[in-house]
């Protein structure tokens, strides 16, 4: 176990603080409207020192959204380990999504950046995040489909329903 005073640990802690503050700004001001100077000012840093951790604003957006999708996939992993019941998976996945948002708002843990502006990113970053979001989306939609097959969820258009639920969760934040 490494020391919390090691350079690597300090770098990771500072990086996490930057991503968390940037995520909060992206959610309130929008990723397009937030500048690196905004992030630096909120952290009491110079813009120059921020460049030690991120290359560009797009890189910062990418890192925040990537962290968000990792957290969403982890929450689905937990849900899948807890239950095989598809309706319960839908409900628990939504509950976990809400918990992530509420924890962010209450200052517990890292702030969650709702991945709402992926389109502003360069092609390679955008494509990777879109693939990860689609993978998460398909997992969630699969819970709905399995529930319909088992008769515990009424017949619906699963793509539209999954999209509506996930979008509502991100926009309610």
Predicted segments with their positions:
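N-terminal intrinsically disordered/low-complexity leader segments
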Residues: 1-13, 20
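Hydrophobic/aromatic residues within well-ordered alpha-helical segments
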Residues: 14, 57, 68, 72, ...
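Hydrophobic alpha-helical connector segments
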Residues: 63, 77-106, 161-165
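Hydrophobic alpha-helical segments that form the core
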Residues: 95-96, 141, 155-173
């Amino acid at each position: 176990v490494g020391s919390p005073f090691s350079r690597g640990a300090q770098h990771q802690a500072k990086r996490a603080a930057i991503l968390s503050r940037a995520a909060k700004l992206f959610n309130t001001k929008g990723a397009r409207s937030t500048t690196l100077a905004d992030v630096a000012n909120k952290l009491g840093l110079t813009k120059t020192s921020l460049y030690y951790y991120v290359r560009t604003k797009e890189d910062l957006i990418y890192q925040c959204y990537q962290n968000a999708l990792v957290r969403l996939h982890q929450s689905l992993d937990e849900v899948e380990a807890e239950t095989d019941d598809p309706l319960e998976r839908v409900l628990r996945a939504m509950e976990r999504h809400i918990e992530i948002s509420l924890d962010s708002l209450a200052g517990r843990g890292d702030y969650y950046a709702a991945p709402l502006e992926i389109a502003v990113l360069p092609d390679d970053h955008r494509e990777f995040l879109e693939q990860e979001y689609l993978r998460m989306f398909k997992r969630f939609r699969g819970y709905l489909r399995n529930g319909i097959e088992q008769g515990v969820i009424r017949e619906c258009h699963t793509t539209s329903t999954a999209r509506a639920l996930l979008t509502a969760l991100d926009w309610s934040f």
